[in-house]
């Protein structure tokens, strides 16, 4: 049997042998341009994730929904209560609150029990406002007592009435601290000193009445202080000297307060004199003069 053999032996490439490279081919400019555009298109397509890709979809942020009142047209309406109160000044707010308390006594009682007690500085601030109004009403130049009185009558009466309302607030038993009571009385007496003096006696009754009321207030505080602490802090605080100066400036219209100081605190100096210590290091102190009854007497000067 004849077997036809090929003139060249058969050659089988090895499995791991790299394939032979084909000879290079020359490409036209048109072919290269079209392939470049196709590659760019492929890149653009790959940059966009397909809808069916398993990539995580971006979370869509929900916008806050606006409260829309369906079926209600925009129309004017009054301010809410908090906004309305913001527009009121102190005077207007006080007037509104006072009107409500007068119409509803139970609300007024609740306000009085809930509001904090006024301090001395707070009371003096209010009294200072009344005092400023009084000073602004005083006419310039030399005016007659009658004209001046009717110019200042309204603010004068308002200030005197305010003094009459504030003074009991700082007296015992409402005020338990003697120092607070004396501090208020000291400043209140100074305010009374600054009230206008009129030539006619018929126009002086406001100031005279204020002196009488403040004198009785001094006497009450001095008496209660003597009961609690024996009056030592009155003497140590030199309130006897303060009161004596007020009495002198008022023209002796604080006589009731001066008598209370002598009767309630005078025994301190008497006891100290009995032990040979003296009521004060200064024999000419006002307290010693009050005790000895020599206050206001002429003082001798020179070697007599």
UniProtKB/Swiss-Prot annotation:
Any one GO cellular component localisation term in the record: cytoplasm
Entry keywords, A to Z: Cytoplasm, Nucleus, Protein transport, Transport
Bias-annotated ranges (Polar residues): 46-63
BP terms from Gene Ontology: nuclear protein quality control by the ubiquitin-proteasome system; proteasome localization; protein transport
InterPro entries linked: Cut8/Sts1_fam, Cut8/Sts1_sf
Any Pfam family: Cut8
Subcellular location(s) of the protein: Cytoplasm; Nucleus
GO MF terms held by the record: proteasome binding
Keyword tRNA-binding attached: no
Keyword field contains Chaperone: no
Superkingdom of origin organism: Eukaryota
Region feature Disordered, mapped onto this chain: 1-66
Transmembrane segment boundaries: none
Assembly: Binds the proteasome.
Family per record: Belongs to the cut8/STS1 family.
Biological role: Involved in ubiquitin-mediated protein degradation. Regulatory factor in the ubiquitin/proteasome pathway that controls the turnover of proteasome substrates. Targets proteasomes to the nucleus and facilitates the degradation of nuclear proteins.
Protein name per UniProt: Tethering factor for nuclear proteasome STS1
Organism: Sordaria macrospora (strain ATCC MYA-333 / DSM 997 / K(L3346) / K-hell)
Gene: STS1
């Amino acid at each position: 049997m004849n077997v036809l053999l090929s003139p060249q032996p058969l050659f089988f490439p090895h499995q791991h042998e790299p394939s032979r490279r084909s000879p290079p081919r020359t490409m036209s400019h048109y072919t290269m341009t079209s392939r470049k555009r196709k590659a760019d298109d492929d890149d653009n397509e790959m940059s966009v994730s397909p809808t069916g890709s398993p990539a995580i979809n971006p979370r869509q942020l929900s916008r806050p929904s606006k409260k829309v009142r369906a079926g209600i047209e925009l129309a004017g309406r009054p301010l809410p209560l908090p906004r309305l109160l913001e527009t009121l000044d102190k005077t207007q707010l006080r007037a509104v609150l006072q009107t409500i308390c007068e119409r509803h006594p139970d609300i007024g009682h609740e306000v009085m029990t809930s509001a904090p007690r006024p301090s001395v500085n707070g009371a003096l601030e209010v009294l200072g406002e009344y005092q400023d109004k009084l000073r602004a009403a005083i006419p310039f130049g030399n005016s007659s007592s009658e004209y001046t009185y009717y110019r200042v009558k309204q603010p004068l009466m308002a200030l005197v009435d305010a003094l009459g309302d504030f003074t009991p607030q700082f007296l015992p038993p409402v005020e338990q601290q003697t120092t607070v009571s004396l501090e208020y009385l000291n400043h209140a007496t100074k305010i009374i000193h600054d009230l206008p003096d009129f030539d006619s006696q018929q126009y002086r009754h406001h100031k005279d009445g204020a002196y009488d009321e403040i004198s009785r207030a001094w006497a009450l505080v001095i008496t209660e202080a003597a009961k609690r602490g024996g009056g030592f802090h009155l003497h140590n605080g030199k309130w006897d000297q303060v009161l004596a100066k007020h009495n002198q400036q008022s023209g002796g219209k604080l006589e009731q307060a001066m008598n209370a100081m002598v009767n309630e605190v005078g025994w301190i100096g008497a006891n100290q004199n009995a032990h040979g210590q003296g009521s004060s290091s200064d024999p000419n102190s006002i307290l010693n003069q009050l005790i000895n009854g020599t206050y206001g007497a002429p003082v001798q000067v020179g070697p007599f």
